[in-house]
Each structure stands twice: as structure tokens, then as C-alpha cells.
């Protein structure tokens, strides 16, 4: 291994650390506070993700949260793909996406109490195998139109996506990573699953804003 390869190897490790910190940024909490909507953790489900931000009644802030939480997973993958050279950037880009996803689930800034990871999951899928995002979106929309339950829609979609990726993605690392992330998303929805089983899961409602 020459000096250039050693340099890029250390650079790759540094990128993984940065990916985690980027993933840890709680955009939902930051945006709702900036918009003076209060602490999103005290609203609805108490989650910092898009669905709960939407419950504040501010659709623009919810959309911005969705965008930024998604891009967390995509940007780090793009950086790894185009800047990690000459070492194998395929495995590094996959790991960068996973570290960003892990950071969203367990953010250091919030004492490791983060979101459920759906938006960042989509961002990682976008960076690794973009057709998976289309499959997720179609399944989510169909499920939501029938039940109006965001959590159920997400659970159905993340269950189907790994199967699709396994069938059509040529990358072993991508297949494994998306499958692991799907399991983690399901685990993070454990409270939602319990409520779904007893018929007490909250449907998506938007808080009316005064004025």
C-alpha cells in the first residue's frame, strides 16, 4: 500500500465519522424551533421526523424536514463515490450511507434518541439504488390511500423494498445494507406496531394554525 492509498484510507474513515455526525443533525427539531412552532418532541408522537412535524400544521417546514432528512443519506454517498479514490469506493459509499442513517436513529446531539429513519432510509436508497425509491413511494402512497396511516405505509414499503433490491440490484453490499436498514426501521416502529395491533394507531392529522 503506497502513501496515496494510506491517505485515502484514513480519509475514508474520517468520512464515515462525518457521515454519522451529518446523519445526527435533527432537522425536524431545528426547523420547528426556528419557526417558533415549539419543541416537536412534545407534539403528537414526540418524534422528530416529517410526519410529526406535519402535525404542527406547517406543511412547508414538514416538507423541508423531509428534504433535508433525505439528503443526509444521499449527500454522504455522493461524496464517497466521487472523492474516495483509489480505494474501493463502493463499500465506502455504502458504509457512509449507513453511518448517516445510524446517526439519524441515534443522534449524539439528542442523547442518541432520534427519529425512525424513514426519510434518511430513502436518501440512502436514492444514493445506492434509486429505483428502490420509486418502489417505496408507490407502495407507500397506495397503502396510505387505503388506511391513512403513515406508520403502516412505511412498514409495508420497507418490507417490500429489500425484496425488490435483492432481485434487481447487482451490488451485494447494497442489498445487505438496505435489508439491515429495513429491519432497523421496523424495530424503531415497535410502538407503532403495538398500536396497530390493538387498533389505536393515530392517523395523520394536521394541526390547524391560528390566523
Swiss-Prot record:
Keywords, sorted A to Z: Cell inner membrane, Cell membrane, Lipid biosynthesis, Lipid metabolism, Membrane, Phospholipid biosynthesis, Phospholipid metabolism, Transferase, Transmembrane, Transmembrane helix
Residues annotated as transmembrane: 10-30, 64-84, 90-110, 126-146, 164-186
EC annotation from Swiss-Prot or TrEMBL: 2.3.1.275
One Pfam family in the UniProt entry: G3P_acyltransf
Subcellular location: Cell inner membrane
Catalytically driven reaction(s): an acyl phosphate + sn-glycerol 3-phosphate = a 1-acyl-sn-glycero-3-phosphate + phosphate
Complexes and interactors: Probably interacts with PlsX.
Biological function: Catalyzes the transfer of an acyl group from acyl-phosphate (acyl-PO(4)) to glycerol-3-phosphate (G3P) to form lysophosphatidic acid (LPA). This enzyme utilizes acyl-phosphate as fatty acyl donor, but not acyl-CoA or acyl-ACP.
The protein, known as: Glycerol-3-phosphate acyltransferase
Source organism of this protein record: Bartonella bacilliformis (strain ATCC 35685 / KC583 / Herrer 020/F12,63)
Gene, per the UniProt record: plsY
